[in-house]
Swiss-Prot record:
GO cellular component, as recorded: cytosolic large ribosomal subunit
The keyword Transmembrane helix appears for this protein: no
Domain of life, per lineage: Bacteria
One GO BP annotation of this record: translation
Keyword Ribonucleoprotein part of the UniProt annotation: yes
Keywords per UniProt: Ribonucleoprotein, Ribosomal protein
The protein's name in its UniProt record: Large ribosomal subunit protein bL19
GO MF annotation: an example: structural constituent of ribosome
Length: 116
């Protein structure tokens, strides 16, 4: 029974998900259906949380839009997600960056991780 569930989960998982973590700036392209039309909507922001649970993995992205903080949670292996692109690697010391909710401006900046 357990093997059947694992096999079904592995079948539904996406293989093209890039490696990213908290502090990274990502662009998530989401399929949006409006009326009868389908289009891609880009959501760019900083990953503030990531939850690794196989097929049920999720991550939260935060951005500032018109001076207002906007957060959106995505299921990593959702069929609605067209692509995930990592724009910038961030250097942080925490797994969850919920403290960014209280900060704005320069104090909310994240250092960039330099490749070796």
């Amino acid at each position: 029974m357990n093997n059947i569930i694992k096999m079904l989960n592995d079948e539904q998982m996406k293989q093209d998900v890039p490696e990213f973590g908290a502090g990274d700036t990502v662009v998530v392209k989401v399929r949006v259906v409006e009326g009868g039309k389908e289009r891609l909507q880009a959501f760019e922001g900083v990953v503030i949380a990531k939850r690794n649970r196989g097929l049920h993995s999720a991550f939260t992205v935060r951005k500032i839009s018109n001076g207002e903080g906007v957060e959106r949670a995505f299921q990593t292996h959702s069929p609605l997600i067209s692509s995930i692109e990592v724009k910038r690697r961030g250097r942080v010391r925490r797994a969850k960056l919920y403290y960014l909710r209280e900060r704005s401006g320069k104090s909310a900046r994240i250092r960039e991780k330099l490749a070796k």
